[in-house]
Regions:
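Polar low-complexity intrinsically disordered regions
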Residues: 1, 18-23
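Bacterial N-terminal signal peptides that target proteins for export
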Residues: 1-10
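Bacterial N-terminal signal peptides
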Residues: 9-19
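Small-residue-enriched, tightly packed secondary-structure blocks
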Residues: 24-183
């Protein structure tokens, strides 16, 4: 019996979620402020120029561990903390869904720099959604030199492990909860 063309696509869509790392689709890796401090230290050690970026930014969100994976359909998720001028103000969750050619899984750390009060306010109100055109700078010895803000936002990532091949389209969405809020 010959199957119609769309059956393989349906089968792939059903099987793909089972291949995504559990960190990417579960509630996400948890983070604590001491882990965030260690990640910030690693970022600054790798590129000392980032110390000025941290100091000059109105705010930043640090996600110590983001899990990402997929086969055709992909997802990423991580939990972190949000700072305003170096002071802890809230928690955040990063969520990403992608579609396109992708195979594998990886784990990385991510810092989202918020240049000014407007960018920080958008983040806190849940209005910050990074589209496919937003690009992250991979942490190297001179990442700060390549860092460019787009709509008041810049992203730096540092690989922790894994291997991922991708030419996919998707965006990141962030949630925010102020420290001390119960709802």
């Amino acid at each position: 019996m010959k199957l119609p063309f769309h059956y393989p696509a349906v089968l792939l869509a059903l099987l793909a979620p089972s291949s995504i790392p559990s960190a990417a689709i579960s509630s996400g890796p948890t983070a604590d402020p001491s882990e965030v401090a260690a990640v910030i230290k690693k970022f600054k050690e790798k590129d000392p120029g980032l110390a000025k970026v941290f100091a000059d930014a109105q705010g930043y969100a640090v996600f110590p561990t983001v899990g990402k994976g997929g086969i055709g359909l992909g997802a990423a998720r991580g939990k972190g903390y949000v700072y305003q001028r170096g002071r802890l103000i809230g928690r955040s969750t990063l969520t990403q869904v992608t579609i396109g050619f992708q195979l594998g899984g990886q784990v990385y750390s991510e810092v989202v720099f918020l240049k000014d009060a407007a960018a920080l306010d958008n983040f806190k109100r849940g209005r910050l959604k990074l589209d496919a055109q937003a690009s992250a700078v991979a942490l190297t010895a001179r990442a700060s030199a390549d860092l460019a803000y787009r709509n008041g936002v810049a992203i730096v990532t540092m690989a922790k492990g894994g291997l991922m091949y991708e030419a996919s389209v998707g965006g990141q969405k962030f949630s925010y909860k102020a420290i001390g809020k119960t709802s």
